[in-house]
Amino acid sequence: MSTMALHRTASTKSDTTMACPNGLVKNLPLGGNTKCSACGSHRAEKRRASSTSSVSTTPTSPSFSEADWSPLHNSSQEPQPEYTKVANSLMRAITDYVGHLQNENLPMPSLEPAADAHGVLKHPEGVAARNAVVELAQRIVAMTMDPDMNLLISSLQFHFCSSLKVAIDLKVHEHVPRRGSITSSELAAKVGADESILVRIMRALILKHVFCSPTPGTYAHTAMSWCMMKSPDAIDLLGHRLDESFRASSRQADALALVNYREPDEADVKGFSMAFGTTENFWEVLGHEGEEERAQRFNRAMRAVSLNTLDVIPRMYPFDRIRGDGLLVDVGGGLGQVARAIMGAHRGAGLRSCIVQDAHAGDDAKKQPDVMEANRKLGVELQKHNFFDPQPVKGASVYFLRHIFHDWPDRACVKILKQTVEAMGKDSTLLICDQVVDDEASPQATLYDIDMWSLFGGKERNRSEWEALFRSADERLYIKKVWTTAEAPTTMLEVCLS
């Protein structure tokens, strides 16, 4: 019998309800006493049920019965084991999360391969509820599994990455139908692989819910595998992660041992340089003749990253209220994808013009005349510039650096900052779009940090690390405000001169 069935509670009709003081259940019939049937508490608050509906800003109750989610509990009020406490917390977090989804008219979580399977939560409380579900579910798994076996299985997760790369190389995702399924023999024939090889690869992916097997010997898409069909750039992002990042991470321990486990510097060997047998950094390798396809794939991968926040960034900061000459300088901004989004949303009121600087701006722009035309229409000018060199544009209203600093170790970041500060006027603003990692970092931020570290010697920084970085560059730099959004895992640091 399922846990849900074991702990299903009976409900009785009553015009009087109570609210559990521990927040386990929102509405419970009193049934003649004031004891909460979920937690056993006698301190429940009575309230008269009303037939009139009202609008509330708090999450609505889920449409399913609350009784179905009564937590595991001991009605005698004996101390609960930690395992049971975590289980109760998980059930409450799921209920809370469902309420937020319903309030924002978002679909319920599912593994079905719908293009819009997971909507974007706009309220931070909903994001926090979702994060709580994930964290508590992972904790339950860790507590449930044998610790020796759990550690061993965790140490073998790199095999999932290699299996995913094989599937992408074979374009398996393109041959599995969005609806319905395909047999292993049919799929093997379409991708040009031995059926036995394909079966073993798919077995590893299905463990992580990338594809599924509705019946033995058949495969179908899940929400995760369908993500590979939604955007060609997303495939390039996975390709980059499963190639350069994967290989760099495999040698990161060796690279750290060579520098005696200290913070990396620009000249230090990195996991990437050891994996690729070079003394050059990532950017230098991508500039070599013969590495054009790798460089193009990386550019497409970064375009996929940009798309995740492209519509969010213009709303994160009041660009229409910037002071001074109204000039925004997008330092290291590629060909202007983000700058165009900002100018398209805010040009005219405060923000008047934009210069996008990039080390390869001129060469790359010549190959994409449509991009040049789009920039021209929005008042975006391209300028060839290396951010380690003196900043040629003086006294601009805003110097905007997006996803720059996490690519570099501290000493290199100080150089970039010093060149920028030298050009700033007294009213100039330095806007840095990067992560400000919480002290208890999310899994995403933690893994991004290791990714930046092994590839570039870079890092994701918390607030105190950002403040130390600014002090090292110029004592006058201070954080005026940190702008955040629930819609994307990115942050905007507004930095000024005192």
From Swiss-Prot:
Example GO BP: secondary metabolite biosynthetic process
Active site per UniProt: H406
Recorded coiled-coil stretches: none
Entry-linked InterPro entries: COMT-like (IPR016461), O_MeTrfase_dom (IPR001077), Plant_O-MeTrfase_dimerisation (IPR012967), SAM-dependent_MTases_sf (IPR029063), WH-like_DNA-bd_sf (IPR036388), WH_DNA-bd_sf (IPR036390)
Signals that turn on the gene: Expressed exclusively during fungal penetration of host leaves, the time point at which plant defense reactions are triggered.
EC number: 2.1.1.-
One Pfam family hit: Dimerisation
Highest taxon, organism lineage: Eukaryota
Positions of the UniProt region annotated as Disordered: 1-23, 42-83
Positions of S-adenosyl-L-methionine binding: D358
Comp. bias regions, Polar residues: 1-19
UniProt keyword terms in alphabetical order: Methyltransferase, S-adenosyl-L-methionine, Transferase
UniProt entry tagged with the keyword Methyltransferase: yes
A single MF term (Gene Ontology): protein dimerization activity
PANTHER family, sorted: O-METHYLTRANSFERASE ASQN-RELATED, PUTATIVE (AFU_ORTHOLOGUE AFUA_4G14580)-RELATED
Function: O-methyltransferase; part of the gene cluster that mediates the biosynthesis of a tyrosine-derived cytochalasan acting as a fungal signal recognized by resistant rice plants and leads to avirulence in Pi33 resistant rice cultivars. The first step in the pathway is catalyzed by the hybrid PKS-NRPS ACE1, assisted by the enoyl reductase RAP1, that are responsible for fusion of the tyrosine precursor and the polyketide backbone.
Name this protein carries in UniProt: O-methyltransferase OME1
Organism: Pyricularia oryzae (strain 70-15 / ATCC MYA-4617 / FGSC 8958)
